C-alpha cells in the first residue's frame, strides 16, 4: 500500500522537527567550551593560545558589545596580556545552560593584579568577579561568543581603601 506524499510528510514532520531542534547535552556543551576556560587560567598560560584554538573555529569572534567583536587571534593576544598582568588568574565554570546550539556559561574569575589593571597600579589586593558568556557552537567549536565580565567591580575591589 502506497501512502500519499502528503500523509508521509505529515507522519515524519514531528520526527524531523525534533531532530532539528535537538539540544546538545550539558556534558557535551561543557566539553566544547572547557578548553577555552582552561586557557584563561594562569596555570595554563603557556598553552592558552593552543587551548583557545582547540575550542574555537578559525573565524570565531568574541564580542564584548553588539558591534564590538575581536577575532580569534586578537582574543589570544588579549588573554596573553591579561595573564601577564594577573599572573595568578583563575577562571572557573560555575554553571552551564544549553539552548539548541547556544551555551551560556556563568563563570567566576579571581586574581591579584601584578601590573597595571584597567588603568590602576597594582595594590596587592585581589578581586573576584562573575562573568556571563553566551557561545554559539557548531560542530563542537565556538563560532561566536558574547561576554560580560564585572571588570568595574574588579577595579573597585583592588582599589578599595
Segments predicted by a language model, with ranges:
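N-terminal secretory signal peptides that target proteins for export/translocation
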Residues: 1-4
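Exposed beta-sheet edge and beta->alpha loop/turn motif
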Residues: 111-138
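A solvent-exposed, acidic/Ser-Thr-rich amphipathic alpha-helical stretch
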Residues: 27, 31, 49-54, 58-100
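Bacterial N-terminal signal peptides
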Residues: 7-18
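A short hydrophobic beta-strand element
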Residues: 101-113
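Low-complexity, intrinsically disordered terminal/linker segments enriched in charged
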Residues: 143-161
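Short, low-complexity N-terminal intrinsically disordered segments enriched in polar/charged residues
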Residues: 18-58, 160-161
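A short, structured loop/turn motif at beta-sheet edges
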Residues: 96-104, 136-142
Amino acid at each position: 500500500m502506497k501512502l500519499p506524499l502528503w500523509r508521509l510528510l505529515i507522519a515524519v514532520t514531528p520526527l524531523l522537527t525534533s531532530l532539528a531542534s535537538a539540544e546538545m547535552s550539558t556534558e557535551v556543551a561543557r566539553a566544547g567550551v572547557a578548553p577555552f576556560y582552561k586557557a584563561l587560567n594562569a596555570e595554563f598560560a603557556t598553552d592558552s593560545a593552543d587551548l583557545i584554538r582547540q575550542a574555537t573555529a578559525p573565524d570565531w569572534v568574541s564580542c564584548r558589545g553588539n558591534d564590538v567583536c575581536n577575532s580569534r587571534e586578537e582574543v589570544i593576544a588579549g588573554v596573553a596580556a591579561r595573564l601577564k598582568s594577573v599572573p595568578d588568574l583563575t577562571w572557573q565554570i560555575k554553571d552551564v545552560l544549553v539552548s539548541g546550539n547556544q551555551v551560556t556559561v556563568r563563570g567566576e574569575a579571581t586574581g591579584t593584579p601584578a601590573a597595571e589593571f584597567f588603568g590602576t597600579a597594582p595594590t596587592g589586593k585581589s578581586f573576584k568577579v562573575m562573568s556571563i558568556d553566551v557561545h554559539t557552537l557548531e560542530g563542537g567549536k565556538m563560532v561566536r561568543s558574547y561576554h560580560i565580565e564585572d571588570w568595574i567591580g574588579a577595579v573597585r575591589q583592588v582599589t578599595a581603601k
